[in-house]
Amino acid sequence: MFDRVGAEVARATSLVRYAPGSRFERHVHGAGEEILVLDGVFSDDNGDHAAGVYLRNPPGSAHEPQSREGCLLFVKLRQFAADDLQPVRIDTRAEPWRQGLVPGLSVMPLHEHNGISTALVRWAPNTRFHAHAHPGGEEILVLDGVFRDEFGAYPEGSWLRSPRWSRHAPVTGLEGALIYVKVGHLGAALTGD
C-alpha cells in the first residue's frame, strides 16, 4: 500500500496481486477505480485486460473482477472528480506515442479531466528535462528503468508523490525509464475525500 486515507472504505493507492484463480464478488465502486495492469491478465465484465491495459471505472460502476493466471495491478481507489464519469479502456501496447517537450521524451496521454492529467512517459537513455514546478503535485510509478532527479535515483517499482508546488529537474541515465505519471490531483476535489 503506497497511500491510504480512511478506514474500511478508503481512498487508496496500492499494488494489488491476484493469485491464479482469484475471483471476487460483483461490487460497486461508488467513488471510482483506476487500474494499470502491470503483469498477467486481469478480467472483469468488460473482458480480459493484459499487461499494459489502463482502465478507469467511474463512480457508480460495478464489476466482478477475476484472474485465471494471476496478475499484478497498480490501483487507485476513490480518486475521481464527481463529474468524471467517462469509462476509459486503453491498451497501451497498441497506442501511438507522441513526441515529448524535449528530444528523448515520448508521451502517451491516458486521461485528462479538469486539470488532472495521467500519462505514460518514456525516457530515452540520457534524457534531461528542464527544472519545473507541479502546482497540483505529481505522482510517479517507475515501470521500467531508473528515473532520476536531483533528490535521488528511483528504480523500477518505485513510487513517488511530490507535494503541490514541488520542483525538480528529472533526468535518466544509461537505462532510460518508463513511468506512469499523474499531475494536478493533489488538492483537487475528489469523490474519495
Protein language model annotation of sequence segments:
Residues 1-10, 70, 74-115:
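A short, N-terminal "cap"/entry segment at the start of jelly-roll beta-barrel domains
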Residues 7, 48, 59-83, 164-190:
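Ligand-binding loop in jelly-roll beta-barrel domains
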